[in-house]
Amino acid sequence: MSDKRRYFGTDGVRGKVGQYPITPDFVLKLGWAAGRVLAKQGTKKVIIGKDTRISGYMLESALEAGLAAAGLKATFTGPMPTPAVAYLTQTFRAEAGIVISASHNPYYDNGIKFFSSEGTKLPDDIELAIEAELDKEIECVESAELGKATRLNDAAGRYIEFCKSTFPSELSLAKLKIVVDCANGATYHIAPNVFTELGADVIAMGVTPNGTNINHEVGATDVRALQQRVVEEQADLGLAFDGDGDRIIMVDHLGNKVDGDQIAYIIARDALRRGELKGGVVGTLMTNLGMENGLKQLGIPFVRAAVGDRYVMEKLLEKGWKIGAENSGHVILLDKVTTGDAIVAALQVLASVVGSELSLNELSKGMTLYPQVLENVRFAGQGNPLEAEAVKKTVEDVEADLGSKGRVLLRKSGTEPLIRVMVEGEDGELVQNSALKIAQAVKDNC
């Protein structure tokens, strides 16, 4: 079996709807191939959730047909956050969980990602085995062995109760006014209820999905509307989720953005204070130097993984640690969940706010973020602009200018046709100009 991936990226199979591989015929075959690999003795049951994209209806039907042809039973949850599907996969003792989502991407993209029976992302060897099955012709099981579909009507209620169980029972959110932005995505009918039931005064936004407005000027990838609303409502803080509920960005009462690095720092520091920190914190190559330095001052170990929550997870398991995060808002808390869970992560920060009687603004001041600029350069051509001599020379010049007080990172996105340029350092103006200079060099060589 080849170890070269053709379809699976860092977060499953993803692309533009109607363009290969996100087409009904390919997704049907993907369902069949996955069913062939995942089928074992036992229930042969798969949980299928989706976000609020209009294409989700088409793709879940195609998936179910493929799974049924392989003899697996599909249980639909309807719109459901990615971590909820991971949780339900475990509690239902299903063979696997499948999420139809493109996370933070625009509505016209979609994707398919899988969870194992333990609620974790599939190992590489299983994904490669599924790709190998895709080369074969579809063969249906015998008619009597065909799978059938059912619907789980109380999926949202089950997950709401789970989320609430991760919040300390002796605490309440009764004194907090919170603006909750659900990105018109999968948390729209869940997150507001979680925080309301724990006592908060909740102002909900981004809770009217229409199939095409997911992540559009709302949610974790664009917090401007949330920042404005928090200030207007004189709220204590704001929470922004992405389209599938695995990313969380927060906003303090002054309208300042609090990103995944700061969220992980607050959670780790609170765990240290309680004597419950198990090991250190895993970040990524994109993690701000300010977080690394802040943790170091507390005596908390820190290591970097490759960019992508699956690599953060791998490093956590390797080290035996419990807290990992990306600055984009993926926060993994392995003492509570099996994957990145935005609602659960938010609840841990809120527990720190309530327990310490400090504001989110005060808690986030424990670390100082370095100015960091990220430029995305669209890249759909052949070759690798990162290997171009002109690009290498520009990077060398910038690194010389930054010296030991900054760093540069160039990488290809694992989910979109983009080259990501990140520059970080103490001098904000130098960082901005350096990022633009490198981005232009990349554009010139695409």
Curated annotation (Swiss-Prot):
| UniProt keyword Membrane present | no
Q: So where does Mg(2+) get bound?
A: 103, 242, 244, 246
What keywords are annotated for this sequence in UniProt? Isomerase, Magnesium, Metal-binding, Phosphoprotein
Q: What is its EC number?
A: 5.4.2.10
User: Residue positions of the PTM Phosphoserine?
Assistant: 103
One MF annotation (Gene Ontology) recorded for this entry: magnesium ion binding
Any one Pfam family here would be PGM_PMM_I
SUPFAM superfamilies per UniProt: Phosphoglucomutase, C-terminal domain, Phosphoglucomutase, first 3 domains
**Gene Ontology CC terms, in alphabetical order:** cytosol
InterPro entries recorded for this chain?
Answer: A-D-PHexomutase_a/b/a-I, A-D-PHexomutase_a/b/a-I/II/III, A-D-PHexomutase_a/b/a-II, A-D-PHexomutase_a/b/a-III, A-D-PHexomutase_C, A-D-PHexomutase_C_sf, A-D-PHexomutase_CS, Alpha-D-phosphohexomutase_SF
Highest taxon, organism lineage: Bacteria
Describe the task this protein carries out.
Answer: Catalyzes the conversion of glucosamine-6-phosphate to glucosamine-1-phosphate.
The record's HAMAP family line, in alphabetical order, gives: GlmM_B
Name of this protein: Phosphoglucosamine mutase
Q: Give the source species.
A: Vibrio vulnificus (strain CMCP6)
Source species taxonomy: Bacteria, Pseudomonadati, Pseudomonadota, Gammaproteobacteria, Vibrionales
Q: Which gene encodes it?
A: glmM
